Every structure is written in structure tokens, then in C-alpha cells.
Amino acid sequence: MSFTHDLKLPTYDDLKCPVVNVSSPALRAGSFHLAKYCDLQFKEFMLCRQEEQDPRKCLNEGKDVSLCAIDFFRKVRDTCNDTFTTFWTCLDNARDGEMSFNYCKEEQKAFELCAKNKMNLERPEPGYFSMVRMHDSKRPVPSDPFRIGSLERHPPKLDV
């Protein structure tokens, strides 16, 4: 791919964003609850990436995802730190480094109970993220209709 002088690259200030500084086991341990807690931000970011077809136009949505994840893990630290630490430590020490939930059911249950009682956040049921769920975005529809085909975000109403 060639670049021209017309190409506008983001500045370092545009790219500056706090880092979600958690380990892989901690991220895996909180993944289900994080996905539900930051569902709106994740959907906005993925919709932007799909519609714009240019990651530079979605930097703010990406920052929102990072900030939401940081907020989630801070709340977990403040409310359920002991059960969460026990859970991710179990995942980290699971055999052969596979971080399987199968070996940590008791720790997982304790964390999920704490998240439900203290954070009012239930783990989504299996299949929740594969269900079709509508998202009403406040972002304007992109102006280039040749990028992704139809720009209708909602299916038309059926006359029955």
C-alpha cells in the first residue's frame, strides 16, 4: 500500500490512552463480566470499525473501551478483590498453563456470587453474546455508501 501526502495520520496526543494493565489470567477471569459491563462501548467500537472501515476514525470509541475496562477492574478491586484474586490465581496455576475454567469452578462460583451481590452484575447466560441484540447508536451514519453497502442500521418494518 502506498501513502500520499494527503494521508492524515493521528498525532501521539490522539493516540494517548490509559492502558488496561491486567495480566492474561485476570483478563480471562473477568472476561464474561467485563463484556457485559462494557457492552455498550464494545458495540459502539465494533460498529464504528465496521461502518468506517478506517481505524483512525474510531480512536475515541477505542479509548472509551479502554476506560470502561479500567473502570470495571477498579470496581472489582474495590468490591471483590479477594475472590477475584483467588479465581485468577487458580486460572494462572491451572495445569499446563491452559487457564481452563474447568479446574477453578469453586473459585469462579465465589467470584460470580460476589459480583452479583456487591456489584449487581450477573454473569451472562451461555449464548448471550451470540444472540442478535439491537444497538441504537448516537453516531452519525458514515457518508461513503460505497464502503459497506447499505447504510441502514435497522431493518425495515414489515407490513403484515
Q: What spans do the regions from the language model cover?
A:
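Mitochondrial intermembrane space
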Residues: 1-160
